[in-house]
């Protein structure tokens, strides 16, 4: 309200309420993705690591692709204009800064989940789908054989559904 008063304007009650929500939101950060304490199906690996490996891809020691990059987290950037429009609508239609933050977080989370489910990604390797034995060159004492169980889905990024289902958003308040 100080800006409006500085130039001799007064805001309508709706305008004042929107300005208050904006002021509250100026100290809010919405983080969307995977938390370090979330575990993958093997209960040893963090889901954040699995998401990172799949988003950026991984390489064998010889430089060949082990896991191709499937940048599903870029869905927010890809749909930034849509998210911006959604945010403006949320700001004008919702009563509190918390409601606005939750609506934006939920929308961004849905964008990532939809990307996992709907985008066309590099296909899975046959061993990923069918299962079998392969050498893991990253064993502590050199290459070791590991068993790949095979996936329940041929679609990349979909196996147990944990990556899609466990995407979260966290709202952090305070000075940035």
Give each language-model segment a name.
Residues 1-176:
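Short, Lys/Arg-rich flexible segments
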